[in-house]
């Protein structure tokens, strides 16, 4: 099951990609969960920074090739549908985002 765990350490929100069996490889579900988690964390006025990290022995191994069929034949359209909302949420985040690799 795709997931992103959420935590806080003082004013720092901590988001952890939690698919260690695939080295946190990106899937549409994981991307959606990440975008949702970014939105939830940044809606909290007490959060002044975000740290994004990965569970297990790797931060993120890239695109999960087994899930690539969800992108369909139109690769650009697939990227826009699944990746762009999450990238946009990170880019427009009101607080600094630090990636702990």
Label for each model-derived stretch:
Residues 1-55:
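Conserved CoA-thioester-binding segment of acyl-CoA-metabolizing enzymes
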Residues 39, 54-89:
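Glycine- (often His-adjacent) and acidic-residue-rich active-site loop
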Residues 86-101:
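Glycine-rich beta-to-alpha active-site loop
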Residues 22-23, 70-72, 97:
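A short, structure-level motif marking secondary-structure boundaries and short turns
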Residues 50-51, 59, 98:
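Hydrophobic beta-strand anchors of alpha/beta hydrolase catalytic cores
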Residues 26, 65, 101:
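Hydrophobic pocket-lining residues within nucleotide cofactor-binding pockets
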């Amino acid at each position: 099951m795709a997931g992103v765990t959420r935590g806080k350490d003082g004013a720092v929100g901590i988001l952890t990609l939690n698919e260690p069996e695939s080295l946190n490889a990106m899937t549409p579900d994981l991307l959606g969960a990440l975008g949702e988690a970014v939105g939830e964390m940044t809606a909290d006025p007490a959060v002044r920074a975000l740290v994004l990290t990965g569970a297990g022995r790797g931060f993120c191994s890239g695109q999960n090739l087994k899930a690539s069929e969800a992108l369909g034949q139109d690769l650009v359209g697939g990227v826009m549908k699944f990746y762009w909302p999450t990238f946009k949420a990170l880019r427009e985040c009101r607080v600094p985002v630090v990636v702990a690799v």
